[in-house]
Amino acid sequence: MIIEVLICTIGRGIEKAAEVLTLPRNDVRYLISFQYSDSSELDYIPDKLKSRKDVHVISVRSCGLSANRNNAMKHSTGDIILFADDDNRYTWKDFDNIADAFENNAYADAICFRSATYDGNFSREFPSVSFELCSPPKGYYVRSCEIALRRNSKFPEFDTNFGLGSDVLACGEEEVFIHDLIKQGFKAIYCPVTIVCTAASTTGSFFFKKSSVRRSKGAVLAVIHGYWGALPRIMKYALFNVKGMSRLSALHDMYCGVVYAKKIGRC
């Protein structure tokens, strides 16, 4: 079983990508999807990446994190693929945990795991037991670095309307991807095992600071629950979860996300 780590980076982020690598092992490879806007940026690729036989760098002139992840998936060849950013850190034990989970859950097409911060603490609260992602517990959400897939060319792509670099919706691409995957009949589960260390903050954690994140919240709810199902949910969220800013402003932005999801045909 070959595990392939798909590292998505842009610009000078490629200089940090080498820090994601562990010591070489026969069953682990790395594919780096490197987005650039000017050919001069190709000089940013460090020699350490060029010298590793287990590393393959794919350079692509494009923008948007979802497009970058799609490019990485398109060029992947491993049996198991997992998504990484240039600030993720792995150990050999992490890879062993991933391989064991897929061997023990042969029916699973996708497994979502736990992530930890650099100091070893969980990045947030996680459920302590496994479950199928078609019926997740209340409050659960997934980060891209927690997703591992049994590679399949029929998997859906990440929706490029969502994620960093998109015009309107700054995040939510992971939740939409998992939703689309399950909707197409693939089996996805959660496994309470830690597989990666990463930064504690995410784009989604800026809900109170960025309107694009608030729009994303509404749009994701619309994709998952439909237009009419999203409306009571954003109202409830604004009433009980919004603090430190105008509830009406937050509700307005989330509603704009719901409307946008309908406009682009996602609900």
What is the meaning of each model-derived region?
Residues 81:
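Short aromatic/hydrophobic "clamp" motif used to bind/position activated sugar donors
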Residues 208-267:
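Non-catalytic, C-terminal membrane-associated alpha-helical segments of glycosyltransferases
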Residues 119, 131-150, 162, 168-169:
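A recurrent flexible, glycine/aromatic-enriched loop bordering the glycosyltransferase active site
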Residues 160, 185-197, 209-210:
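Catalytic beta-strand/loop signature of glycosyltransferases that borders the donor
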Residues 60-76:
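Glycine-rich, basic loop-to-helix element that forms the pyrophosphate-binding segment
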Residues 163-179:
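Acidic donor-binding loop at a coil-to-helix junction in glycosyltransferase catalytic cores
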Residues 93-125:
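Conserved donor NDP-sugar-binding/catalytic core segment of glycosyltransferases
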Residues 17-59:
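Acidic donor-binding segment of Leloir-type glycosyltransferases
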